[in-house]
Amino acid sequence: YQIRGLGAKRKVPDFDDLVFLGASMSRYPLEGYRETCNTSVILGDRFAKKPIKLDIPITIAGMSFGALGANAKEALGRGASAMGTSTTTGDGGMTQEERGSSKYLVYQLLPSRYGMNPDDLRKADAIEVVVGQGAKPGGGGMLLGQKINKRVAGMRTLPEGIDQRSACRHPDWTGPDDLEIKIQELREITNWEKPIYIKVGAARPYYDTTLAVKAGADVVVLDGMQGGTAATQDVFIEHVGIPTL
């Protein structure tokens, strides 16, 4: 089978297909020059001692160091901070550049466990347990050797220049009951301060969301199929999962 990155090339519904309901009588319009529209959102106040308050309900999803360079990760942190929102580490751990430039940084915990460091969990503002990605729900991935330079290899405890297969599921839990235990473990490591996200690839969103909430997640992240990935089977990218819309 063919391995490639990015998202689906086929035409799927996207955000350009959205239409919005305007205000009239049943919903009174605001005068923009003297009234404000509050777009802030609080994430994590269900259980976390330190929930995150974002100025806008739009965040930057995970893109790993290795797929992106240190300058790009720093730029994402600066941009997110300027807009009052969060950015996400992606697979492979946390860089000093990204942490230093990000007001709110979400740390991803993936099945591969690449770069996983309890100290970095405590430095993050939230933790995102990645069960799956929209571009490959239920499937693993491939970290190409050409991306594994000396720094990436050191962060992920891998040999330089060798292709690495990423697991399709976490090695230490197999279902929602185990997930509840894992969430409790992460809360204890971080002194119950950090919001815990659960990220799933959009495939069975009703059931997956129900199980994630039941397991104790503060936030559920649904990743649509066109979200993209670093590398996986082409058939997954094109034909598995459902679009965000």
Task: Name each region found by the language model.
Residues 57-63, 163-170, 230-237:
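Glycine- and acidic
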Residues 108-114, 153-157, 242:
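Glycine-/small-residue-rich beta-strand-loop submotif within the FAD-binding core of flavoenzymes
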